[in-house]
């Protein structure tokens, strides 16, 4: 993204990929601009993609608006480098990755996707969603362009006495407990595990399961948590919810996506574009 030629080529090839697969827009996941120069180049890149999307639409899909979105960080060290007001102008939505607040990379156990900080147990809440959302809005992003991301998985900590405490391992390495697709990460449909009881931190707004026998703690969202998050995002006028990722969900009443759908009152009903005359 450091040169105009590179930005033009990125936009051109991304749009080719979009039309060849019949997508309705482009989502850019840049993790993460490391300094002011990269943050500026990110804005220039997105403006070039927006320009080429509009040019393609004008020629081949008159009246249609292709979406341009990004996956955005919820950690202040990362989002404080971004040009938030500029992003709020050029983008249709900012999909806030409001998860992975704690995991194998953490010194202590913690919530994976809590809404708020817990001053009485700060070790359990090194990050929180509310601070990130408020900072994005304060930085110039329209609230209705912020889409709140929610995890459909849990993060495990082993050999621990509880949340915000020391642990030893997350699974794997011959320890018996591994994960659904990565050591220490469990699909929501596999939770809670047998023998574990679900606990709720009413200050941080975060659920986790704990097995006193195996000393395993897993932080994950429940349907009740999704209802709480939807009420929160509606109270701030945010743009909706998004999830990572659908294959990990449960069916029926326990579905996290289904819970969000019911709480929000429906899905996005924007019509898909069905005609791509330049299809290669």
Where are these regions (language model features)?
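Short acidic, glycine/proline-enriched helix-loop-strand junctions
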Residues: 37-40, 44-46, 51, 55-58, ...
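Active-site groove signature of glycoside hydrolases
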Residues: 11-40, 100
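Short, acidic/polar
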Residues: 2-20, 76-87, 129-133, 220-234
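Active-site proximal loops enriched in glycine and acidic residues that flank catalytic Cys/His/Asp
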Residues: 150, 242-247
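Receiver (REC) domain switch/active-site residues of two-component response regulators
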Residues: 24, 92, 239
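Substrate-binding surface in catalytic domains of secreted glycosidases
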Residues: 31-188
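Glycan-binding loop/region signatures in secreted carbohydrate-active enzymes
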Residues: 102-105, 109-120, 150-232, 258-280
């Amino acid at each position: 993204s450091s040169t105009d030629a590179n930005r033009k080529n990125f936009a051109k090839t991304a749009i080719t990929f979009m039309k060849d697969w019949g997508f309705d827009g482009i989502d850019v996941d840049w993790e993460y601009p490391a300094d002011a120069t990269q943050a500026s180049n990110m804005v220039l890149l997105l403006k070039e993609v927006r320009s080429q999307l509009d040019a393609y639409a004008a020629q081949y899909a008159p009246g249609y608006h292709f979406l341009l979105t990004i996956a955005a960080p919820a950690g202040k060290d990362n989002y404080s480098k971004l040009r938030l007001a500029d992003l709020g102008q050029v983008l249709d939505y900012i999909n806030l990755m409001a998860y992975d607040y704690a995991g194998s990379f953490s010194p202590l156990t913690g919530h994976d996707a809590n809404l708020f900080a817990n001053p009485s147990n700060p070790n359990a809440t090194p990050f929180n969603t509310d601070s990130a959302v408020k900072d994005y809005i304060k930085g110039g992003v329209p609230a209705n362009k912020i889409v709140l991301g929610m995890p459909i998985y849990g993060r495990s900590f082993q050999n621990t006495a509880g949340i915000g405490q020391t642990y030893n391992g997350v699974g794997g390495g011959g320890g018996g407990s591994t994960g659904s697709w990565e050591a220490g990460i469990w699909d929501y449909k596999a939770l809670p595990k047998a023998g574990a009881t679900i606990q709720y931190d009413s200050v941080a707004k975060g659920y986790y399961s704990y097995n006193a026998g195996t000393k395993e703690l897993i932080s994950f969202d429940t349907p009740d948590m999704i209802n709480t998050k939807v009420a929160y995002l509606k109270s701030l006028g945010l743009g909706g919810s998004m999830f990572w990722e659908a294959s990990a969900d449960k069916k029926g009443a326990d579905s996290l996506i289904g819970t969000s759908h019911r709480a929000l009152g429906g899905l996005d009903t924007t019509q898909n574009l069905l005609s791509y005359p330049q299809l290669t």
